[in-house]
Amino acid sequence: MSDQATTLRIKPLGDRILVKREEEDSTARGGIILPDTAKKKQDRAEVLVLGTGKRDKDGNVLPFEVTVGDTVLIDKYAGQELTVDGEEYVIVQESEVMAVLK
């Protein structure tokens, strides 16, 4: 678990994952500083914390396909957004992760 996630004391349940979207540059290519309202949500996010795991019909915990520290691709509308100490995070289900970026 990353230091950042440890200080948050957030433990997602089931097959949910706590991620932090990558920050978009606040300056456009031409050097213009963009206001927050002009920025778009990033599709890339870093995996910070894994949930307790999804269970199969026999009660066995299924392994996650992602690991802490992975950079993943998620839909810009995926998950539940939350703000803790001024930092924005998203809790998504593993099925909302479209790819792991290498």
UniProtKB/Swiss-Prot annotation:
It comes from the Bacteria. Its main location: cytoplasm. One of its GO terms (biological process) is chaperone cofactor-dependent protein refolding. It is found in: Cytoplasm. One of its GO terms (molecular function) is unfolded protein binding. It holds the Pfam family Cpn10. InterPro entries: Chaperonin_GroES, Chaperonin_GroES_sf, Chaprnonin_Cpn10_CS, GroES-like_sf. Signal peptide: none annotated. SUPFAM superfamilies: GroES-like. NCBIfam families: PRK00364.2-2 (NF001531), PRK00364.2-4 (NF001533). Together with the chaperonin GroEL, plays an essential role in assisting protein folding. The GroEL-GroES system forms a nano-cage that allows encapsulation of the non-native substrate proteins and provides a physical environment optimized to promote and accelerate protein folding. GroES binds to the apical surface of the GroEL ring, thereby capping the opening of the GroEL channel. Heptamer of 7 subunits arranged in a ring. Interacts with the chaperonin GroEL. Belongs to the GroES chaperonin family. This is Co-chaperonin GroES. It comes from Chlamydia caviae (strain ATCC VR-813 / DSM 19441 / 03DC25 / GPIC) (Chlamydophila caviae).
